Amino acid sequence: MNYTLSKRLCLTAMLTLAAVVYTTSAFAETSKLVIESGDSAQSRQEAAMEKEQWNDTRSLRQKVNTRAEKEWDKADAAFDNRDKCEQSANINAYWEPNTLRCLDRRTGRVITP
């Protein structure tokens, strides 16, 4: 009986020691988690700076878009004019690809098909 009691005491001591070691390691591994609303002074300042930069580049973006649109319109108009020139009833009309104009073979002047 004495042998069983010593076994139980030893087992209890080992479990207690294991529990202490486990809890101290658990305390050592915890970290602090802070959840912010995202409304700090730094984030507001960064947002204001990004908005200012976006507004400053707005005119440049509009100019680039306008230029691209004009170039596309010019190419589209030239394509339509080429079709009209090639389908023209005028035998002397030909399409000049370098100048994107319909010209008269005899005179070299611009004609409207």
From Swiss-Prot:
Residues 1-28 form the signal peptide. It holds the Pfam family DUF1283. InterPro entries: DUF1283 (IPR009700). It comes from the Bacteria. Belongs to the UPF0482 family. This is UPF0482 protein YnfB. Keywords: Signal. The lineage of its organism: Bacteria, Pseudomonadati, Pseudomonadota, Gammaproteobacteria, Enterobacterales.
